[in-house]
């Protein structure tokens, strides 16, 4: 299975989510940033992943499941802040959270 790294920028009323692929000790961007809840990040990411033939169906499902978990968690809280850091890192170990105030 390919290794992916999520980047989540936590803004005031939304999150921006992008996906990178881990290549040895470096990462390469797979997607641009998708904003939630401003747009349907899940649907946009799904369409983009479908257009990349090198991403297998099992990897696409894996990635979309993580995105679903991120979106659902954010929807419950309506925000992420630095006080959430320990729980977020435990729940989402492959996600890099960036806080912007």
From Swiss-Prot:
Its main location: plastid. Coiled coil: none annotated. GO terms for cellular component: chloroplast; ribonucleoprotein complex; ribosome. GO terms for molecular function: structural constituent of ribosome. It comes from the Eukaryota. Keywords: Chloroplast, Plastid, Ribonucleoprotein, Ribosomal protein. InterPro entries: PSRP-3/Ycf65_sf, Ribosomal_PSRP3/Ycf65. It is found in: Plastid, Chloroplast. The keyword Iron-sulfur does not apply. One of its GO terms (biological process) is translation. Gene3D superfamilies: 3.30.390.140. The keyword Ribonucleoprotein applies. Part of the 30S ribosomal subunit. Probably a ribosomal protein or a ribosome-associated protein. This is Small ribosomal subunit protein cS23. The lineage of its organism: Eukaryota, Discoba, Euglenozoa, Euglenida, Spirocuta.
């Amino acid at each position: 299975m390919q290794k992916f790294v999520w980047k989540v920028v936590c803004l005031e009323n939304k999150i921006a989510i992008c996906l990178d692929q881990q290549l040895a000790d470096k990462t390469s961007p797979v997607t641009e940033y998708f904003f939630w809840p401003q747009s349907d990040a899940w649907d946009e990411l799904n369409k983009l992943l479908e257009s990349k033939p090198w991403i297998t169906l099992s990897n696409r499902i894996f990635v979309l499941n993580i995105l679903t978990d991120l979106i659902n968690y954010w929807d419950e809280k309506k925000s992420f802040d630095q006080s959430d850091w320990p729980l977020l890192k435990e729940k989402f170990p492959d996600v890099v959270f960036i806080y912007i105030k």
